[in-house]
A protein has these predicted regions:
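Active-site-proximal, acidic helix/loop segment immediately C-terminal to a metal-coordinating Asp/Glu
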Residues: 2-51, 204-207
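Generic structural signal for well-ordered alpha-helical scaffold segments
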Residues: 49, 53, 184-185
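Short proline/glycine-enriched turn/loop segments at secondary-structure junctions
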Residues: 54-59
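Short hydrophobic alpha-helical segments used for membrane anchoring or interfacial signaling
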Residues: 67-72
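A short, structural micro-pattern
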Residues: 60-61, 190
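Non-transmembrane, aqueous-exposed alpha-helical and coiled segments at domain scale
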Residues: 73-103, 112, 116-239
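Short hydrophobic/aromatic beta-strand or adjacent loop that forms the aromatic wall/cage
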Residues: 62-66
């Protein structure tokens, strides 16, 4: 990881909370304490800027720039949202999905059950993982992240929009424990490329709700566009 910063960082707090600003050695120690092989460039930059704001008592007395670059390995993330239109395609779809390298994320209760059946395991709901806004997550052995479907994806979109609008939002997002936040972090800070497999099956219970099939497809297309804007290579397939 390479960290470059302007004098606004080293001068942070001068005459306010410190006598001579934020000492270079202290900055280096801060970076080392907050570094891990998985911490994103945006998270590191936001952490440094947050400390500058604290030292300046939120006044930001000097122009401050932080640039962080990180060399990392490729990390594909494969996301299945909804089961295929025909149950006859379940087996081939699962083989396609799990045949891809990288992490595997499953969104939706029906999808989770189909995946668990294919893997020969059970779906376990994670107690306490839900909020008023986001349904609880589940756990499937062999799957990296399992969330509820369209409601979670809808909130994930909001999280991604907030992330792209405000570079400091990563610090808030990192402390959220719901499925939408975890999904947003995986897509934004872990994935180098995203493969979305969108199931064409209709959910009759949602036909007359705000989450009709057409709306779900539109939502997933918006997710693709937002991730592309975030610099991800995104491929979307409909099954």
């Amino acid at each position: 990881m390479l960290v470059i910063f302007s004098a606004g960082v080293s001068e942070a707090g001068r005459g306010v909370t410190t006598d001579a600003g934020w000492a270079r050695q202290d900055i280096e120690d801060f970076i080392l304490r907050n570094y891990s092989p998985t911490v994103s460039s945006q998270r590191m930059a936001a952490s440094i800027l947050s400390t500058v704001k604290t030292l300046d008592m939120d006044a930001m007395h000097d122009d401050t720039t932080v640039v962080v670059a990180r060399l990392r390995e490729r990390c594909p993330v494969n996301v299945m949202i909804g089961p295929p239109e025909s149950k006859d395609d379940d087996l081939s779809t699962m083989r396609l999905f799990f045949g891809k390298d990288g992490k595997h994320v499953v969104c939706g209760g029906t999808t989770a059950n189909a995946v668990a059946s294919y893997l020969g395991v059970k779906v376990h709901t994670l107690p306490g993982s839900g909020t008023e806004e986001v349904p609880p997550m589940s756990e499937i052995h062999g799957v990296d992240l399992t969330t509820e479907g369209v409601v979670t994806v809808n909130v994930t979109m909001k999280r991604i929009k907030d992330y792209l609008a405000d570079g400091m939002y990563t610090l808030e997002l990192a402390h959220m424990k719901d499925g939408a936040s975890k999904l947003a972090l995986v897509l934004l800070e872990e994935a180098t490329e995203v493969n979305v497999l969108f199931g064409n099956a209709s959910n009759l219970a949602q036909q007359d709700t705000e989450f009709s099939f057409e709306r779900k497809l539109q939502l997933v297309q918006e997710l693709r566009d937002m991730l592309t804007l975030a610099g991800k290579t995104v491929k979307m397939s409909i099954c």
